[in-house]
Structures are given as structure tokens and as C-alpha cells.
């Protein structure tokens, strides 16, 4: 609750920074504040659970996922600061919108009432509708914003209808009451299904993924980085929290639906990604396939399943942020992110090539990176639940992903150098990239810390 209030105040301060003479100071203020808020939030992990006005709950789950979301926001601010150096974008307004979106994400992982679920989704999404189209003279960016807004509004309508039906069946917006009064009323199950469809849109599960490639490729790359990491973590955290708050075990019909969605998302996402020759668009479809892996544990409402989801999301978010940052560097230098523009990067900038390779290896699930352990732990949980065929599909999908991830890696190290990058990573940014890359390896080699956190949420 305190983190939500503090980041909200920080967003308002950023929005007013030009008027109160803090334009040059707002960036360090945001960084220092986020570090302080992250530290404060993490220190409350072992506190007793608290409910605020029956709307928000402060417990280990909200603290763990909230800390992960704040960490993603902090890394985003550090990595993509250079995006505002040209003066094309209003720095204070953009920073404020990102912070407000962060508030929405924190609400989504701590709600205990359906009204707060809806508010969290809207607070998260509305700033991103604006940011996706912030490159006003670029028709692709404008198209991205319009598509995201229209389809996002459609998903919101489905969510509202689901909430209304659940309220009609149970007479309450409170999840604790819904859990006690849930019955065989068809309205209740239709409502849950509609809510699940709305979340499937937010996490880009097939067949609700059709907006992803156009929105991600059309939006400014630094906004794509935020959407593909922060939004995905917040949406998955909220989706699992909703199911865990209502059911002791997922109903059979919903379990089979989620398994089918997971398998379809893995297959379609990986096959579509393998046909892309633009790395940014490839990462968009890769994000779709990654959503399929995460959905595998949703029919399993156990502590270990929750832990595997948390660990996987942490590794995915860090690796994806690194990859998209380097895509932006190449885009600025070469004009776009086609695979051939990465040719020879291993010779012209070995550091960038190495960290990009490491992030792609992690996304592919190859040891010793975080992605390998995340997939291993996740697959193990699904096998224990008896869904062996789903794991076989996931393994096949992972094998397909090796092809398109390594297509970029091979181009970097075996291709002829096209030209030297005009905007290579340097200074503080390179230090942060090194730290994030180290985290990708350390999570893979020493996952015990994240496992301990996960087992207590």
C-alpha cells in the first residue's frame, strides 16, 4: 500500500517537474526514490498479512511480485534513459506515465476485490495506450496505439461483463466472499471464463495474441520493452492471484481450457517467431510462446507451482529487457532490427554481442542461464501434475525456439561486419547490463534465493 502511494506521488511530481523547476533533477529523484521504495517494500516481506479497506492485501505474494515489478521499472529507467536525449519526447510526462502504469501493476498483484482488479488493469493500460503512439509522426506508432487501445478496450469490456456475472451469481465483489459462496451457478462459471479470456488477451495467449506483433513492432522500442516485461509480469501475477483467491483447485473445464491455451500458445508462438527476419518482431512472437510456458502451471494451484511461475517470470523479464535494449541500439544505428543488421556485432562490439547472446540463450532455456532453471522447475511441476503431453509439446517448442534465437547469435559471430554501431552501450548503462547479465547467470546457477522467496508466497 505504501509503495503504491509513494510511486503515485512520484508520478505526480514527474508530471509537474517542468513547472516546478525539477526538469533536470527528476531523473535522479526517480532513481533514488525507486531504489528506496524497493528496499522498503522488500523489508516488509515477513510482515503479517494486512488488508486495506477490504480492497488491497499486503502479504508475501504482493511484496514478492511488487518488488519484481519495481525492479523491472528501475532497470527500465536506467537502460532507456538515452531514449529521451534527442528531445523528441517529453521526459517528465513519459516518466509520469510509466510510474502511473507501475502503480497499476502493483494494484494488480495485491487486489482482494474485483473492483480493484478492474482499476488495476485500467491504471496499468491507459498510460501505455498513450505511450505506444508517442512517436506522433510515425504512422506505425500511431497504428500501434490505436490497435492497442481498441483491442484493449474490447478486453476490458469482456472483463467487466465477467465481473458483473460473478457479482450476479455471488452477490459480492470481494474474493474471500466469492470463494465461500461460489456454486454451480452457470453465471459464475461464465463470469470466470470471461475474466480468463480478458487475462488471456493481456498475457498475449493464442488466439488472443493477434495484437502483439503490430503493437510491439510499431511502438517505440523502449515502450515495447516495458510492455513485454512489466505488463506480462503484472498480468500473470494478477491472473494467478485471481484463480488462487477463488478456487482450492481449478475446475476441470477451466483446467482443460488453460492446458489447451498453453499448448496452442507454445506451438503458434514458436512457429510464428521462426519465420521472422526482424529481431524486434521475433521477440514479440517469442513473448507469445513464453506466455504459453507460463500458462502451463495455472491449472496447478500449489505453492510449488506459484514458486515456479515467480522464478520463470523473474528470469524472463531480465533477459527480455537486455535483448530489447540491444535491439534499440541496433535500430538507432542501422535504421531497423533485421537479422542482417546484427551481422558482425561480435566483432564491432563484443560486449553487446555477448550480453545479447546470453539473454537469448536464457530465453531459449539453455544452461547455465536463468531460463533453463525456470523451464526445468516449471516442467517438473507440470509432470508431477500428470500433464506429460503438455510438457512434451513445451519441449518441442523449446527446440524450435533454439533455431530462431541462434539465427541472431550466429549472425553476430559469423557474419561480416556491416558497420560500427553509432550508439554503443557505455558508462553506467554498460555496468547495469553487466549486472543484469550476471543476474541471468546467477539465477540459473544459484536459484535458492528466489526459490525461498517463492516458497513463502
UniProtKB/Swiss-Prot annotation:
Where does the UniProt annotation locate this protein? Cell inner membrane
Q: What are the record keywords, sorted? A: Cell inner membrane, Cell membrane, Membrane, NAD, Quinone, Translocase, Transmembrane, Transmembrane helix, Transport
Is RNA-binding one of the keywords? no
One example of the protein's molecular function in GO is: NADH:ubiquinone reductase (non-electrogenic) activity
What are the transmembrane regions?
Answer: 2-22, 25-45, 60-80, 92-112, 114-134, 149-169, 188-208, 222-242, 253-273, 283-303, 310-330, 353-373, 382-402, 431-451
Gene Ontology CC annotation, any one: plasma membrane
InterPro entries linked: NADH-Q_OxRdtase_suN/2 (IPR010096), ND/Mrp_TM (IPR001750)
Q: How does it assemble?
A: NDH-1 is composed of 14 different subunits. Subunits NuoA, H, J, K, L, M, N constitute the membrane sector of the complex.
What HAMAP family is this protein classified in? NDH1_NuoN_1 (MF_00445)
Q: What is this protein called?
A: NADH-quinone oxidoreductase subunit N
List the top taxonomic levels of the source.
Bacteria, Pseudomonadati, Bacteroidota, Cytophagia, Cytophagales
Amino acid at each position: 500500500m505504501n509503495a503504491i502511494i509513494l510511486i503515485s506521488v512520484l508520478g505526480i511530481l514527474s508530471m509537474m517537474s517542468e513547472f516546478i523547476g525539477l526538469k533536470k533533477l527528476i531523473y535522479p529523484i526517480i532513481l533514488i526514490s525507486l531504489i528506496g521504495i524497493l528496499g522498503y517494500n522488500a523489508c516488509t516481506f515477513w510482515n503479517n498479512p494486512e488488508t486495506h479497506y477490504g480492497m488491497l492485501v499486503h502479504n508475501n505474494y504482493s511484496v514478492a511480485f511488487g518488488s519484481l515489478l519495481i525492479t523491472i521499472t528501475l532497470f527500465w529507467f536506467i537502460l532507456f534513459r538515452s531514449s529521451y536525449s534527442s528531445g523528441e519526447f517529453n521526459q517528465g510526462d513519459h516518466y509520469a506515465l510509466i510510474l502511473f502504469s507501475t502503480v497499476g501493476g502493483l494494484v494488480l498483484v495485491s487486489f482482494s476485490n474485483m473492483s480493484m482488479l478492474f482499476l488495476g488493469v485500467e491504471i496499468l493500460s491507459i498510460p501505455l495506450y498513450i505511450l505506444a503512439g508517442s512517436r506522433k509522426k510515425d504512422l506505425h506508432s500511431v497504428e500501434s496505439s490505436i490497435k492497442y487501445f481498441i483491442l484493449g478496450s474490447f478486453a476490458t469490456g469482456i472483463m467487466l461483463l465477467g465481473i458483473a456475472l460473478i457479482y450476479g451469481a455471488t452477490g459480492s465483489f470481494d474474493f474471500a466472499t466469492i470463494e465461500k459462496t461460489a456454486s454451480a451457478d452457470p453465471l459464475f462459471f461464465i463470469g470466470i471464463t470471461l475474466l480468463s479470456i480478458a487475462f488471456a488477451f493481456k498475457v498475449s495467449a493464442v488466439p488472443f495474441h493477434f495484437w502483439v506483433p503490430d503493437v510491439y513492432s510499431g511502438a517505440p522500442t523502449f515502450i515495447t520493452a516495458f510492455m513485454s516485461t512489466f505488463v506480462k509480469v503484472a498480468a500473470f501475477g494478477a491472473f494467478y492471484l485471481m484463480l488462487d483467491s477463488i478456487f482450492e483447485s481449478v475446475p476441470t473445464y477451466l483446467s482443460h481450457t488453460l492446458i489447451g491455451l498453453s499448448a496452442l500458445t507454445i506451438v503458434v508462438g514458436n512457429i510464428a517467431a521462426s519465420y521472422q527476419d526482424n529481431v524486434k518482431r521475433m521477440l514479440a512472437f517469442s513473448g507469445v510462446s513464453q506466455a504459453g510456458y507460463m500458462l502451463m502451471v495455472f491449472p496447478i494451484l500449489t505453492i510449488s507451482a506459484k514458486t515456479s511461475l515467480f522464478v520463470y517470470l523473474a528470469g524472463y523479464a531480465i533477459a527480455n529487457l537486455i535483448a530489447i535494449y540491444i535491439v534499440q541500439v541496433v535500430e538507432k544505428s542501422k535504421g531497423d532490427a533485421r537479422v542482417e543488421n546484427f551481422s558482425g556485432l561480435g566483432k564491432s562490439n563484443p560486449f553487446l554481442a555477448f550480453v545479447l547472446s546470453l539473454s537469448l540463450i536464457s530465453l531459449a532455456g539453455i544452461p547455465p542461464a536463468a531460463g533453463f532453471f525456470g523451464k526445468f522447475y516449471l516442467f517438473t511441476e507440470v509432470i508431477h501434475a500428470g500433464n506429460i503431453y503438455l510438457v512434451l509439446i513445451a519441449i518441442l517448442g523449446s527446440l524450435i525456439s533454439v533455431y530462431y534465437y541462434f539465427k541472431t547469435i550466429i549472425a553476430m559471430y559469423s557474419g561480416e561486419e556491416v558497420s560500427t554501431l553509432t550508439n554503443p552501450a557505455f558508462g553506467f548503462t554498460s555496468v547495469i547490463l553487466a549486472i543484469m547479465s550476471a543476474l541471468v547467470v546467477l539465477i540459473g546457477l544459484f536459484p535458492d534465493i528466489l526459490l525461498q522467496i517463492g516458497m513463502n508466497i
